[in-house]
Amino acid sequence: RIDKKNSIILGLVYGLGHKTQGYANYYDQQRQNKVYVGDTLSLRNGFELPHTFGVGLTWNYNNRLRVAADYTLQKWSKVQYPTLSRSTSGYTYTAETGLFSDLSKYSLGAEYVVNPDGYRWYNRIRYRLGAVYTTPYTKVNGSDGPRNYQVSAGVGIPIINSHSNRCVLNLAAGFEHVAPQIRGSLKENY
């Protein structure tokens, strides 16, 4: 708490990356003279989930205005993923790193309420805005995948009944733009 009307909250988060303890199987089926011939290559512990780091900061003014910013980093560039490679002795199926990029996510949001303790219901409506920018972790033909942009707006309408005055009906609308890095790819809007 900074003073009577202002407070700041700092948050940190960590997600432990780990192997999934499963098998990755590659099935190769070919047709030779009307007969299907198959081969299977297996790899134990071929998949991993990334370490995740996050930091967030929220400023609260008099319980009427909240502004928050978050940053999240997922270390996808360090995870192992099964890859089929051709060598002089045939095919090999191994877990390799560097097939993905690190994902960064930047978020910003705000909420405003005229009077959170007001007698009139319309004074307790919560107005919200938010924006998110995300870099991709996927790669397409060696290039970074599509970047993601999102914006949203919403309201929280208080519902008052004889049992509780804490119920809120949340309504929101959002827009998302997916922008590929490869020229000629389709851009998507939701």
Specify the residue positions occupied by each region the protein language model found.
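Outer-membrane beta-barrel porins/channels
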Residues: 1-190
